[in-house]
């Protein structure tokens, strides 16, 4: 990669995977997979285009649009669209690369991709967002389709934006097909899709608790970051299962519970309304049971916690914050966001797992812990293909099965390729990375994307 422009986010994601594979027995048993990794690390296709739209004052505005179609060996490209001023090719390549292996862990037939634009929806009128989405889809529709590439939502892209984009696609392509997921229920969407990533995260961590002998969620104190869909629905499910939610956050700061009762369902409903109006948590009218900490992430302010769930954005847990969580008694960390922990933070957690054995913290990477969102997107694709709608109970049951399989697949793969010392919990980061990876080179080899020397 030395001859290419610096892509720090993508390089971090690549190095994390490569480090895991090199430090397992996978390459000893299958040295040819080094070739597969080199091939899989380059996207099949990168589409970059301009998006020209008109603001409410009649002025011409222009943004950069992208779609990284990373790997289609397991199925159509699948991954979200992100609208945020920070969007660039490095971030989308990192997200698309992670998406390949996350999608593989679901067991569904989906490849990996990611897209978006450096457009900031904050402060924009509904009409401006509609005009931008239509202009964005005017180019993107040429490159996607129900059996080619099926985008979904991500940061800055919710049900409203998916609706505008789907309408623009339908008009441009003259087809009504399952080309986007996260659609409205009356026009091809799936029940539990908005809740899926948060619910799936909670289901996954439930298996971590059970396997390690820590019991249920009842009485556990849980720190969350973020206040979007993932954090909102994870918090609601945690409260339903008896846990105490002690924090939420956004880019302006953190809400931290000061009393024993934690953040309540009523608080979360109010936060949902704030976020629906595209406002900051600074407008939340908090009572005495929570405090607002300006400009902070929650990890060093939550006091004693049992579980930490980063659900905001990449690299939101630093080495110092990881050490702070250990000092606060945290025993479980699972990423609801993609690459939520820095490499240094992961190293802190993994070293603790090896040193403290049964008393250690247990860390789960986002590609496994947050795969519930794309899993239900895959279930939405299946429903669209059959022109059927499953009940909420049916979708939730399938989601639970997928998260259970993702957990045990990573766990058992770790036991095979990254053996733990006696009394040590298996490495879920190693197991999940390897389990997600091995499916992809096998399919690529069968399809002639790489080959071994005779």
Curated annotation (Swiss-Prot):
InterPro entries: Aminoacid_DH-like_N_sf, Glu/Leu/Phe/Val/Trp_DH, Glu/Leu/Phe/Val/Trp_DH_C, Glu/Leu/Phe/Val/Trp_DH_dimer, Glu/Leu/Phe/Val_DH_AS, Glu_DH, Glu_Leu_Phe_Val_DH, NAD(P)-bd_dom_sf. SUPFAM superfamilies: Aminoacid dehydrogenase-like, N-terminal domain (SSF53223), NAD(P)-binding Rossmann-fold domains (SSF51735). Signal peptide: none annotated. One of its GO terms (cellular component) is cytosol. CDD domains: NAD_bind_2_Glu_DH (cd05313). The active site is at residue 114. Homohexamer. This is NADP-specific glutamate dehydrogenase.
